[in-house]
Structure formats: C-alpha cells, structure tokens
Regions:
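Hydrophobic alpha-helical transmembrane segments in multi-pass integral membrane proteins
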Residues: 81-89, 136-150
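Alpha-helical transmembrane segments and their membrane-interface exit regions
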Residues: 45-54, 102-112, 156-167
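Short, amphipathic, aromatic/basic-enriched membrane-interface segments that mark the entry/exit
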Residues: 4-17, 62-73, 119-129
Length: 187
C-alpha cells in the first residue's frame, strides 16, 4: 500500500486554495476598492502559495495522473509570477496585473480542458463537468484580459476556484483506489 500522505496534502492544498479563490473572487466583486489597494501583495502571496501546492501535487502519485499532470511547470511559473508581483512597484499598472491574472486563468482552463478529454478516455463521467467548468473559467479569463475590470477578475477567480475544486475532488484518486462507477462516487 502506498503512503497517501502526499496525495492528501496536495488535495487539501487544492481545496484550501480553491477556498482562497472563492473568498478573493467574492471580495473583488463586493469590495473592489479594498482589493485594488492591496492587489499586488495579495496576488503575490496567492500565486506563490498556489505554485507550491501545484508542485506538491505534481509529485503525488494519483491513480489517473489527471488532477496534477501539468503542475510542475505551472507551479514554477506561478512562484516566479508571485515574486514578480511582490517586487513590482507602483509604476506597474493594475490593468497589467489583471491581464496577467486573465492569462493565467485562461492557461489553467485550457490545461483543464485537456484533463477533461483525458478523463473521458478513462471513462470518468465527470469529464463533462470538468469541460464545462474549464470553459467557464477560460471565458472569464478572456474577459479579464479584454476588459481588465476587478469585477470580471472576481468572477474569473470564482470560476477558477470551482474548476480546481471539482477537478481535485473527482480525478485525484490514490493508486490503491478500488474502482467504482464514477456516478456512485458523486452521490
């Protein structure tokens, strides 16, 4: 039996970062002034944390290798982007930070679309929902890139959080997982 500690840490990390996305997204919509005032610090800390969680996820051994399959390179990218967000000064426009967020969410959603297609190959019925959530997050990512508003950023963060949360809940299985119908698991 394989030690499940690392996969549990990765799954817990993804669920926690999803909750952070939910809270941050809600605050972007409900209190945009507060979020704009502290956006660089908040973004930097979240990006670095998310990058670390992605790298931990990459090295965990889940049954399907779906939830964390692209996370090593993405994790390093997020950490670097987080450091840049923390180091930039006031000369960097908030619209540029929002555009970077939109690009990041678009990239993550495109990789998740590929995860949905791979899930279909494994016969997981959850692939349809992964695809829908990924397309929704990607759409909001594009809107953030084009419009650069804090409200769209909030919606994009909510969609990203929902997508990540669902993917980790429905694709991250331990290697000693006994196969059950995916429909039974979602009850």
């Amino acid at each position: 039996m394989i030690d499940l500690k690392q996969i549990k840490i990765a799954c817990t990390g993804y669920i926690l970062i999803s909750i952070v996305f939910y809270i941050t997204g809600f605050l972007c919509i409900a209190a945009p002034e507060l979020m704009q005032t502290h956006s660089r610090i908040i973004a930097g800390v979240i990006l670095i944390t998310y990058g670390i969680i992605k790298i931990i996820g990459y090295f965990s051994k889940d049954l399907y290798c779906l939830a964390f399959q692209y996370d090593f390179a993405c994790g390093i990218f997020l950490i670097v982007l987080g450091i840049v967000a923390l180091c930039i000064g006031a000369r960097f426009k908030d619209s540029s930070l929002l555009a970077a967020l939109g690009i990041l969410i678009l990239l993550d959603s495109l990789l998740s679309i590929q995860t949905a297609l791979d899930s279909k190959k494994f016969g997981l019925s959850s692939w349809k929902y992964i695809l829908i959530l990924s397309m929704s997050a990607g759409t909001f990512g594009v809107l953030v890139i084009l419009k650069s508003t804090i409200t769209f950023a909030g919606c994009a963060l909510l969609a990203e959080g929902g997508m990540r949360h669902y993917i980790v809940q429905h694709t991250a299985k331990s290697p000693d997982y006994q196969y059950q119908d995916d429909n039974e698991l979602s009850k």
